[in-house]
Amino acid sequence: METYTFEPQRVCSKRIDFALDEQARLHDVKFLGGCPGNLPAIAKLVEGKDAREVADILRGNPCGSRGTSCADQLSIAIDQALAARSA
């Protein structure tokens, strides 16, 4: 299992930590800062799920006028982690 840390942009959370197993499933998603109800719920919902599917679902989900959201930023983090694994 590989762990990743991502610094999101233009959102309330300051850091996203997560792990990917050998089959590219998400584990141990943690948001530092941000909404204390929604973000732990997202982490529970995505636990053990296919990272590509999660990124596809969360990508483009905005929060207000920010043009992004913590969920959208998680999709970016996943995309970057998967790209790094393939490189």
What would you call each of these model-derived segments?
Residues E7-S86:
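Active-site- and interface-proximal helix/loop "cap" or "latch" segments in soluble metabolic
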Residues M1-T5:
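Short, hydrophobic/aromatic-rich segments at coil-to-beta transitions
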